[in-house]
Amino acid sequence: MIIIGGGVAGLMAALAAAPRRVTILNPGPLGAGAASVMSQGGLAAAVGATDDVALHVADTLAAGAGLCEPEAVARIIGAGPALVETLLRLGVRFDRHGDGLALGLEAAHARPRILHANGDQTGAEMMRALIAKVRATPSITIFEATARKILVGDNGVTGVLAAVGDEAIALPADRVLLTTGGIGGLFLHTTNPESAIGQGLMLAMDAGAALADLEFIQFHPTALDVPGASLPLISEAVRGEGARFVDETGAYFMAGGDLAPRDVVARAVFAHLQAGHGVFLDAREMGVRFAARFPAIAAICARAGIDPATQPIPVRPAAHYHMGGVVVDAAGRTSIEGLYAAGEVARTGLHGANRLASNSLLEAAICGEAAGLAMAAQGAKQSRGWQAMGLPPAPDAAPVRPLMSAHMGVLRDGAGMGLAAQKFSEMAGQNPAAALALQIALAGLARRDSVGAHARAGGKQLYKAA
């Protein structure tokens, strides 16, 4: 069994598969370049005294703009409270309040249900605990290499072609799990690692797996507006603690919608910027409490010369999360025998057209664990050998980023998506990143109306997220 990717989903899968032997294939050391480490906002779970799973389900369905799969929502959200207990047993140190867990409020949640660790370092704390457990598990091998192709025969997956430097290595496996994260690196500005360019989707496409909902890309409304491609995230939790959107004059402009769903807020921020205004988060009412509550964000701001206790924080939308992906069932199985997917690369049906804040770590952990259990339960097949083969072309996101940002961003139109698709088609034969971008643009063109994170100029608004 091979797991491609070393974030929360991949590590949970490896631990769930134990004591069956599994290899984690990762381009670098565990934790390096993983979006999971960068996740600030927290993990949503209905564990509060005033909360219940039905409320969390309702919030998720509302944010998903009518395109969630209710069964998937009920299953994944329903597993949240038990997941919290599992993570505590694995050594994750969530923040506490008195005798219980500290629970925060974020956009479009009806109750405080967001678990944090070290204020705004939830993903990093989860990864710390999971990496320690993985390294202490003898059945898990970590191999630093880059997956370049899923090898598929008549009866399903047969292995992975990987690159170590310029050398091609064929690794036999009848079960392969993709946990490669998202596609933010296909845009000029992203909250993801710049290296997150949809590698898992490219591998799945090449293998012939079914993909869906590729047009639904969430843009986080509050990335720190500083030079560079990978922009630091200013978590939703900052607004949950009372920060407000203001323009360059200090005037509020969100009309009480500071905690609306992300697609709604991102479009409002984008429109304000397009109109020539500045957009800032004003958290000055928190004063010195800001650095205590959000130490990582305070440090990020300090490096940019900003003191949130006395200055508004400049923000802009940036590509953040991909709701679409490889189509999977409840066990993470794709349409290819032996190929699984979990985490952001997978399309589970949980998010619909727009992800609810802090549901991603929840999904990654629950679905990663489910996929690991399913892989371990699948009967092994006879391994096979291969003739020597060369590496396929490496993906190059550089020529893709300007087109994706211009035409597949917060607001789209048919002419722009058509132009992007034409340009991508010219590059697709020799550039897997362009081949993936082409499918995203075609999915956007096919969805003629606006829904959730897919906002098409002139398109009818089919469903307004609550």
How should each PLM-predicted stretch be described?
Residues 68-81, 114-132, 190-198, 223-227, ...:
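Short beta-strand to alpha-helix junction loop
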